[in-house]
UniProtKB/Swiss-Prot annotation:
<comment type="function">
    <text>Specifically methylates the adenine in position 1618 of 23S rRNA.</text>
</comment>
<dbReference type="InterPro" id="IPR016909">
    <property type="entry name" value="rRNA_lsu_MeTfrase_F"/>
</dbReference>
<feature type="compositionally biased region" description="Basic residues">
    <location>
        <begin position="1"/>
        <end position="12"/>
    </location>
</feature>
<keyword id="KW-0489">Methyltransferase</keyword>
<dbReference type="InterPro" id="IPR010286">
    <property type="entry name" value="METTL16/RlmF"/>
</dbReference>
<keyword id="KW-0963">Cytoplasm</keyword>
<feature type="region of interest" description="Disordered">
    <location>
        <begin position="1"/>
        <end position="85"/>
    </location>
</feature>
<keyword id="KW-0698">rRNA processing</keyword>
<comment type="similarity">
    <text>Belongs to the methyltransferase superfamily. METTL16/RlmF family.</text>
</comment>
<dbReference type="Pfam" id="PF05971">
    <property type="entry name" value="Methyltransf_10"/>
</dbReference>
<dbReference type="GO" id="GO:0052907">
    <property type="term" value="F:23S rRNA (adenine(1618)-N(6))-methyltransferase activity"/>
</dbReference>
<dbReference type="GO" id="GO:0005737">
    <property type="term" value="C:cytoplasm"/>
</dbReference>
<keyword id="KW-0949">S-adenosyl-L-methionine</keyword>
<keyword id="KW-0808">Transferase</keyword>
<feature type="compositionally biased region" description="Low complexity">
    <location>
        <begin position="20"/>
        <end position="40"/>
    </location>
</feature>
<dbReference type="GO" id="GO:0070475">
    <property type="term" value="P:rRNA base methylation"/>
</dbReference>
<protein>
    <recommendedName>
        <fullName>Ribosomal RNA large subunit methyltransferase F</fullName>
        <ecNumber>2.1.1.181</ecNumber>
    </recommendedName>
</protein>
Amino acid sequence: MTPSRKPARPGAKKVVSQEPSAKASRPKPSSQSKSKAQPKAKPESKPQAKSQAKPQAKSKPVEGKSQGASKGLHPRNLHGQGYDFDALMDTTPELKPFVRPNPYGNLSIDFADPRAVKLLNLALLRLHYGLSYWDIPEGFLCPPIPGRVDYLHYLADLLAESTPASKGGKRKLPNVTRAPKGERVVALDIGTGANGIYPLLGHQVYGWRFVASDIDPVSLKNVERIIANNPQLAGKLSLRLQSDSKQIFTGIIRAEDRFDLTLCNPPFHASLAEASRGSERKLKNLAANKRAKGHEVAKSKEKLNFGGQKAELWCEGGEQAFLGQMIRESQKFGSQCLWFTSLVSKKENLKPCYRLLEQVGAKRVETLEMAQGNKLTRVLAWTFLTPEQHSLWGLYRV
């Protein structure tokens, strides 16, 4: 199989494109050509590194261009320059008691306070994404909006490659204005949780339709309540309960379904004890950071911000076992989904995934690295369709 040639997507610090070889080995990185159209970097961005393009049979991973949002966020991410707390308090007055100047004179909140974080999310969804109501029950994960919407922006770029230009025109990638929008794009969110954040943002930003699945009836009931209180979401998001805790796609994807992409933020801990240690570590890091900046650190036992139910935080075998099950099941539905994707929190889990993707016959594998402040998040994407099938899929969709 000839390695595909394609440019790096915008905003990613590193893009590794891989296409399985004919031999029984792990996927090989494919070559990439230089991007001709790059979004303009913002003033605080680092100098951009040139992409490499060497059409060799065996190529090394290619460094994509470092793009310009101040936090390393995608160029289309609205939150690259921080939060406008004055505007947020105007839309959500309940947030005001939790906002205060930090030692540098900038407005902020205590991110260890679950009430403050939840109200910040509500304000962001109201101000930037046109939602009037959003809430989660106590004890469920409260997702950071900037990082969640970043995942969607990268997926939009991935879909853009399968969207032909209008009237036979030649597309130039990366083309940040060509990300497919509208209800003909259908996505499947695995493990949507009680917050339903990916379907909510995906519809409000790109107009995509979503199927959201979860193993927890309480979570789906809460997402149903969010939909009911935002009339613009009626008929755009459908919910499906996974009745088998050992299955991911099986029992959710139906024979008539066609998904442009699947997405998932998998549970990354292997046990409740491991998840609890992770929460304690985050709280200690926040407290240490506050002391270093001169903030008063209050003693509190509340951990909702780093809370979450079992299905949200951990599963037997942890992230690696979950991803392995997802990859094996995806083979069964390979002709029904254009792209399968998942976040990967631990870099060491990538190699086992590459080997398994080779075994199940994935035609192409992508690894995207997204920088969000000091945090590095990876998106693993794979497809069982050929480039020709991708083109036909995009042509049929648009």
